[in-house]
Amino acid sequence: MSKGLLISIEGPDGAGKTSVLKVLLPRLREVYPAQVITTREPGGVAIAEQIREVILDIDNTAMDAKTELLLYIAARRQHLVEKVLPELENGNMVIMDRFIDSSVAYQGAGRGLDQDEVAWLNNYATDGHKPDLTLLFDVDSETGLARIAANGEREVNRLDLEKLDMHQRVRQGYLDLAEAEPERIKRIDASQTLEEVVEDTWEIIKSYL
């Protein structure tokens, strides 16, 4: 697919994936022969960041599930062609904070949209590109939401306002994806201490370098 290495990090809200990435980045940059680029979805480039603001705005409570999905898909396409693919072509490692699996878990399992249709839209938007490795940071929904509530630095967004059962469906959607694609998606127990999660993650990534 490309000269570089594409890694996505996924998980339900409050799993701590961003904290793990911050700790691991210095290690990765020491051992990877090219640049290590981090980016996020939705966002990463100007157009996609503008779409992100619309999606996450807490005032947009009237947003329909399909509208939400299509906004994510539009942001994904722009981000991929403008930033991700050029970096991969240059031989760099790209680490994406969320990618295609988020749509299946959140809009598919969480919102109840047809998961085959979500997968088709993902494929259409990405021309079939998938991560070489997906790290799934898994934590039960109650723990994840408690972490969000305790994090005073994190700005609350529209998705944080969803009820517990929505978050539980999202988590199950992720677990189903991991079961369906075990070679690509590696589950990490994110209920452990940060140090333990970091080491588990590092062992997985090392096998792909």
Curated annotation (Swiss-Prot):
It holds the Pfam family Thymidylate_kin. This is Thymidylate kinase. NCBIfam families: DTMP_kinase (TIGR00041). ATP binds at G11, P12, D13, G14, A15, G16, K17, T18. InterPro entries: P-loop_NTPase, Thymidylate_kin-like_dom, Thymidylate_kin_CS, Thymidylate_kinase. The keyword Metal-binding does not apply. Belongs to the thymidylate kinase family. PROSITE patterns: THYMIDYLATE_KINASE (PS01331). GO terms for cellular component: cytosol. One of its GO terms (molecular function) is ATP binding. It is an enzyme of class 2 (transferase). Its EC number is 2.7.4.9. Keywords: ATP-binding, Kinase, Nucleotide biosynthesis, Nucleotide-binding, Transferase. The gene is tmk. It catalyses: dTMP + ATP = dTDP + ADP. Phosphorylation of dTMP to form dTDP in both de novo and salvage pathways of dTTP synthesis. GO terms for biological process: dTDP biosynthetic process; dTTP biosynthetic process; dUDP biosynthetic process. It comes from Streptococcus thermophilus (strain ATCC BAA-250 / LMG 18311).
